[in-house]
């Protein structure tokens, strides 16, 4: 299985991507778009595992750009808010062969790429295009989707304790993680997620986007998290779930207190939390306000996101608990790489199909 075959899960006329005030993109249109972008990139001389940096704002075009590049080459999404010096570091470290930017953007990545002689191409959205549609080049060439062992996504660790490290993830890593998360959340093609996570981060890319696509489900791609708009967006889109970090959940709860009517009757099937520890008080309040399971999960970039998760069933979630392993093997080891008992203190070690080959 690869990212390109993952996209075959959705029925032709099923909705894949939506965005506020935009026509929806169906799975048939998404597959055509992904294949067209693959041919356009091939026409510029790129092939499987070649890295393509993507610097675009959150939204449907960023989502489809990731899926298209990862299906045929290797996607290297970067934070569109970086400074030129930061782009210079990441571009030099990643050595992409191309940078994709939003049409008309004056992002400083242009100058950083120019200094490194890396070509930049604009993603041009046509009038009345559905959410996620854009074009890069006029010329196209035959293109072969990436294989299971080709690099699909490359990100950096946060670098909070040392120099950020490159984390390459291959196609089978992404597929395994999407499958594991979809299973733990019991996703189906009737689910609709509101994405509020940045799409240059493993959480949004895998837990929301790739996982939904693997089940033929749909994703509403907002321009980014806005607590003032969240409840209205959730109601208008009739979403069944969302995934966020604790600070987002806290901001949503603050709005829910001020907009009690808007918070009622959303009918959420679940709320997922990851990327930081969810305070027990926030866990309880989310349960109380939205009347649905709150699923806290534990993940890291090197594991293509999720390693453990709370079970979905009623009453099976525990506050302050990251859950049980969701397919990868997880254990605690000491500095000599000897396994320890579960109540011992040591390093968390993982092994599985979703773990980066390094």
Task: Give the role of each language-model region.
Residues 12-13, 127, 138-156, 162-163, ...:
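Conserved pre-ATP/AMP-binding loop-to-beta segment of ANL
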Residues 175-192, 202-240, 255-258:
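Conserved AMP-binding/adenylation subdomain of ANL enzymes
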């Amino acid at each position: 299985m690869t990212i390109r075959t993952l996209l075959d899960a959705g029925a032709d006329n099923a909705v894949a991507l939506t965005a506020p005030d935009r026509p929806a993109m169906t799975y048939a249109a998404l597959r055509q778009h992904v294949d067209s972008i693959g041919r356009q990139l091939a026409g510029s001389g790129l092939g499987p595992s070649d890295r393509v940096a993507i610097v675009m704002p959150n939204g449907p075009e960023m989502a489809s750009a990731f899926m298209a590049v990862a299906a045929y080459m290797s996607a290297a999404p970067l934070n569109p808010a970086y400074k030129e010096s930061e782009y210079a570091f990441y571009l030099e470290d990643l050595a992409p062969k191309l940078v994709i930017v939003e049409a008309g953007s004056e992002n400083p990545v242009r100058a950083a790429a120019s200094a490194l002689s890396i070509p930049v191409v604009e993603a041009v959205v046509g009038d009345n295009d559905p959410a996620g549609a854009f074009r890069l080049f006029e010329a196209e060439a035959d293109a072969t989707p990436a294989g299971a062992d080709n690099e699909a996504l490359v990100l950096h660790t946060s670098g909070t304790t040392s120099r950020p490290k490159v984390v390459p993830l291959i196609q089978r890593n992404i597929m395994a993680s999407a499958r594991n998360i979809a299973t733990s959340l019991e996703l189906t093609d009737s689910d609709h997620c509101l994405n509020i996570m940045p799409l240059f981060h493993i959480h949004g890319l895998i837990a929301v986007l790739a996982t939904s696509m693997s089940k033929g489900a749909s994703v509403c791609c907002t321009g980014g998290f806005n607590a003032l708009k969240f409840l209205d967006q959730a109601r208008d889109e009739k979403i069944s779930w969302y995934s966020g970090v604790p600070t987002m959940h806290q901001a949503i709860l603050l709005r829910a207190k001020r907009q009690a009517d808007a918070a009622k009757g959303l009918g959420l099937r679940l709320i997922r939390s990851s990327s930081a520890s969810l305070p027990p008080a926030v866990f309880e309040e989310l349960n109380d306000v939205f009347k649905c399971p709150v699923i806290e999960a534990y993940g890291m970039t090197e594991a293509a996101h999720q390693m453990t998760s709370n079970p979905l069933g009623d009453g099976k979630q525990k506050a302050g608990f990251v859950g049980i392993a969701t397919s990868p093997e997880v254990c605690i080891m000491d500095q000599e790489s000897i396994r320890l008992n579960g109540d011992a203190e040591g390093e968390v070690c993982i092994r599985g199909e979703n773990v980066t080959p390094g």
